[in-house]
Amino acid sequence: MTDVTVKSLAAEIQTPVDRLVQQFADAGIKKSDVDSVTQQEKEILLAHLNREHGSVPNKLTLQRKTRSTLNIPSTGGKSKSVQIEVRKKRTYVNTPEAEQAKAEEQAQREAEEQAQREAEATAQKIAEEKAKREAEEQAKREAAEKAKRQAAEKEKVTNQQTDEKTKPAQTDKARREAEAAELKRSVEEETRRKVEEDAKRVAEEARKMAAENEGKWPEPVAEQTESADYHVTTSQHARAAEDENDAKVEGDRRSRTRGGKATKQKKGNKLSESKADREEARAVGRKGKRKPSTLQQSFNKPVVAVNRDVVIGETVTVAELANKMAVKGSQVIKAMMKLGAMATINQVIDQETAQLVAEEMGHKVILRRENELEEALMSDRDIGVEAAAEHRAPVVTIMGHVDHGKTSLLDYIRSTKVASGEAGGITQHIGAYHVETENGMITFLDTPGHAAFTSMRARGAQATDIVVLVVAADDGVMPQTIEAIQHAKAANVPVVVAVNKIDKPEADPDRVKTELSQYGIQPEEWGGESQFINVSAKAGIGIDELLNAILLQAEVLELKAVRTGMANGVVIESFLDKGRGPVATVLVQQGTLNKGDIVLCGFEYGRVRAMRDELGRDITSAGPSIPVEILGLSSVPAAGDEVTVVRDEKKAREVALYRQGKFREVKLARQQKSKLENMFANMTEGEVSELNIVIKSDVQGSCEAICDSLEKLSTDEVKVRIVGSGVGGITETDATLAAASGAIILGFNVRADASARRVVETEGLDLRYYSVIYSLIDEVKQAMSGMLAPEYKQQIIGLAEVRDVFKSPKFGAIAGCMVTEGVIKRNNPIRVLRDNVVIYEGELESLRRFKDDVSEVRNGMECGIGVKNYNDVRTGDVIEVFEIIEIKRTIA
């Protein structure tokens, strides 16, 4: 081959000249762009590049497409033509295994040639040495014989001696050549035998290595024949003829399509039949005994398990998890059963369960965060980082036991009459107010003290800075007082104790201090950290001292907040107003909330259409520690949800819908989670009576508290099921739901509209209104008590001792008895006792006194008793008469 320059070679292989020169230098060949390159240097460069980058197996792919027509007979003697297009593909791969086998064969052949050459050289060398040694020995023998002979007649005998000397030499030479040839043959046979043994050993090692590699993922060596195109092995003329036939078939199809009618094929028309048609006809002629196609694919089942990276979201179904791990759904269900969880293939499971199952099956789990949109929305907020934090008013929550004077104390501070407006004189939802004092502003949260409002008190403690614990001086520490202390400690909030009702004669502040010290509230005069202020909400005693104590505690806490930027806060209370829509009471914690802001509140979103303070006045903005009512949300938010102002309303809507969907999925995943240990409990659920209830309330917090209280009333025999609950008036939808589920409707501070009342009258539903939570809970208890199974008690009413036994033809054995205790009545159940052991339990059939039938016999009188179906009465037995009394059960 003619040598080329480096520059022309770079142009030929389409690579920069500098890069090619550098590659030659890396391979150990110094070249410039004008130097010539030999074929040997090209091979050296190619070997170097293969070592550096790895060799890619040569691959040749041939594709072919065949179109044909298939006639399918149908009903009515007609036939339907179906156009078939067959695409074939054949790939030739120069696999590394073939190259390795070729290299091994070449190495074996070279080894045999080398061994043969070495054997020939060794044999020739041995033969030459042996011939030389024999020639020397022969020369010595001849010299000895020559010395012994007489030198007589030298001239005459010279020719004769020469002839005699030449003849043995020729004979010896022939013998030496024969021995050398024999030695050469033996050496060649020995060498060939060794070479064959080496070749067998190499072949055996190669076979073992192939057997080991066969157990792993096999390379598609059979790809040449498996995915082969038929036309590759045919001749050029056969391919041309078949292409011409396919072209004619395609032309006929197009002409029929243009003509608008499909002409019927002639039976013997070979031109209109393609290769696929002919194969189909032969298959039908053999009655379905079709020859297996050479295009059949083979699959070798993998032996080694494949570990995958499984990406799991917050919720996933069993079928989706199985697809991610590339296993059957039954295997995932089996793995979950081994872990103690029952599941179906379409069941939604939570992220933790899916992670356990995937790791149990040997896969690597990647947990995916699906709230990226929410994080992006929250990060794109102007929160006034550059602005300096300013002092803000403290948020004070008033907590304590019911009727200890919390609202009355706040009422005196605000100089309003709120307590008189509360139903029953007790607070039923959180009231948020801010008060301007001489020393600064204070925001008060008034929480209910009833036991049903536990979650509302906890919510108030989490949103507050200081807790004012109101304890009545005449009542001391009560259960809700203890609960308030626990909420304050859980929220890590300082406590200021207000000992109320100090003006009463029976007031004992020292007892309150002693009782509170048992729960970790130590007064300052005892060395503790809590301030104790004696107050009277009625007389106004100690109110200024209480406010000063609150402000002093706030100064110690150094409460600060940023007033500029987008606001965030917490929902204190929410309800549905018929004229204004969803209304939420929001306590602003950071920033400034303005009218027109876009807010994201839990599962709800919206634009603030209007803002009002606690007095009902319209305002346009609210800073930190200010409670406001906002209008414009999509629905009623849950109390305790975080309120955040965002920029984009569209993204806020997407985040709210995403939260709703996730909440629903997680809730379903938790509900459907069925453990093996709960199976027996689930089997007996059908025996429990259920009281279905539909609850409507005026505010979200009260509705939540009522639902929690009623669900806690459930027992093993009667279960309270809240069919529906909500905020707002009772509508026709609520009445229809109650009628369909057989539920009673409870309205708390709400009323039913005209359409709902019409459904209630038509269906005969039980509709009740309440304004105090005590009455609601008590009446539900009574309804549950009526659903309890009755309890029966056996009460002994009389004892009679058998003195004698008589025989009666009508009743059999008659016991003559003396009534020793109580009254004996006819037709009552009795027991026969012998030696204080019950031997029979039955019914009293006959009761007589002096041969007269009587209904009862009193203490100290004699009578005759006939026991029904029992004749084994003996003297000395005791007959015990009792009656069964039904006991009315109640819910504790």
Swiss-Prot record:
CDD domains documented for this protein: IF2_eIF5B, IF2_mtIF2_II, mtIF2_IVc
The keyword Cytoplasm belongs to this UniProt entry's keyword annotation: yes
UniProt-annotated location(s): Cytoplasm
Spans annotated as G3: 446-449
Hydrolase keyword on record: no
Segments for region (G4): 500-503
A Pfam family: GTP_EFTU_D2
Biased composition (Polar residues): 68-82, 224-237
Keywords: Cytoplasm, GTP-binding, Initiation factor, Nucleotide-binding, Protein biosynthesis
GO BP field: translational initiation
Compositionally biased tracts (Basic and acidic residues): 99-217, 239-254, 270-283
Region (G1): 400-407
Region (G2) residue spans: 425-429
Origin: domain of life: Bacteria
Domain tr-type G residue range list: 391-560
GO cellular component: cytoplasm; cytosol
Stretches the record annotates as G5: 536-538
Compositionally skewed regions (Basic residues) per UniProt: 255-269
Binding site residues for GTP: 400-407, 446-450, 500-503
GO terms of molecular function: GTP binding; GTPase activity; guanosine tetraphosphate binding; translation initiation factor activity
Region (Disordered) residue spans: 65-296
Family: Belongs to the TRAFAC class translation factor GTPase superfamily. Classic translation factor GTPase family. IF-2 subfamily.
Role, per record: One of the essential components for the initiation of protein synthesis. Protects formylmethionyl-tRNA from spontaneous hydrolysis and promotes its binding to the 30S ribosomal subunits. Also involved in the hydrolysis of GTP during the formation of the 70S ribosomal complex.
Matches recorded under PANTHER family: TR-TYPE G DOMAIN-CONTAINING PROTEIN (PTHR43381:SF5), TRANSLATION INITIATION FACTOR IF-2-RELATED (PTHR43381)
Protein known as: Translation initiation factor IF-2
Organism of derivation: Yersinia pestis
Phylogenetic placement of the source organism: Bacteria, Pseudomonadati, Pseudomonadota, Gammaproteobacteria, Enterobacterales
Gene name for this UniProt entry: infB
